[in-house]
Amino acid sequence: MKSHIAIICIIMLSFFSMHEYRCVGSTIGRSSKIYIPLCFHNNCIHPFKDDCWCCLAAGTKKDWCWLEKDFPDAKELCMKTCTRKI
């Protein structure tokens, strides 16, 4: 008799946890949009130092990068010229 009560309690607890998971899971699904920035800091000359800003937008050239040594405002320049083409 005690084992039957224990099994019933375990089943009821698992139903409660499944219900809670379903409620939490629906809110997580809506907020899981990943933001990918247009420009990223990359290493162009020195392998261990990020020294340029490169464009990651769709439809652009692969080598569209600005060296910080040549362009002091490389980040701003990348953000202005690099646009998403959807």
Curated annotation (Swiss-Prot):
Belongs to the MEG family. Pfam families: ESF1. This is EMBRYO SURROUNDING FACTOR 1-like protein 2. Residues 1-21 form the signal peptide. Keywords: Disulfide bond, Signal. It comes from Arabidopsis thaliana. Disulfide bonds join 39-54, 44-82, 52-78, 55-65. It comes from the Eukaryota. The lineage of its organism: Eukaryota, Viridiplantae, Streptophyta, Embryophyta, Tracheophyta. GO terms for biological process: suspensor development. InterPro entries: ESF1_brassicaceae.
